[in-house]
């Protein structure tokens, strides 16, 4: 807190500090949104940083194409130093969710985009105050409000992941992703958008709940009571998830893992990742 106050005194034109009780990342972001004044807002997680040229690149891009949301790439640092992630969608072209439903499938982090501030002032969309998946919930909802989305090929965000990071939290916390997905599905259903984006929402559920959460558990141990719950959750909300057209594009290894998970062959999945050195 002292360092923040010092920086604010040294740079009063661009730094303001709000001291509040710790309520998690989502709660902090919501509090900051009420103070934001610029045309766009960005979200920077602790330990992460922007590349030196990030703001110049963003400013030029948004001046040329003033989109409501402007995505950019990230590079992993720390344990996965050098890995680069960008979206496999048309670049530097204004997109909308109805025309490009695959926008729902891009990386869910709120930190890899500049968001027009009026998206928040004109809607009641905010971050979940607590629990895993606060980014996924906000970003998947906000895409329905955005009139235009632009994706830049530039890697502007440096994401640091290490053994103590939130993304490597306790195994039991994987249950929270089910709450996050349910929050998104309920939101789309309430607005009559579920059927329009059912395939995309189904893939979102398969990826985040059935695959990612199960794999995080099975890389660490061969059994856990949460594993069948993840499968039952997915099957209850998307009974035909195995026939989702997006799943045809999965790599062979991921298809194999999903098949084994669907048969509750958890030990086989554990051994598969153990053999690969995970």
What are the roles of these predicted feature ranges?
Residues 1-19:
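Acidic donor-binding segment of Leloir-type glycosyltransferases
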Residues 2-3, 20-36:
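Glycine-rich, basic loop-to-helix element that forms the pyrophosphate-binding segment
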Residues 4-8, 62, 188:
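Conserved hydrophobic residues forming the short capping helix/wall of the S-adenosyl-L-methionine
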Residues 18, 150-152:
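General small-molecule cofactor/ligand-binding pocket signal
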Residues 25, 46-150, 160-171:
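Donor-binding/catalytic cores of nucleotide-activated saccharide
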Residues 41:
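Short aromatic/hydrophobic "clamp" motif used to bind/position activated sugar donors
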Residues 155-163, 168-195, 208-241:
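Catalytic core of nucleotide-sugar-dependent glycosyltransferases
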Residues 219-278:
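Membrane-interface aromatic/basic loop that binds lipid-linked glycans or pyrophosphate carriers
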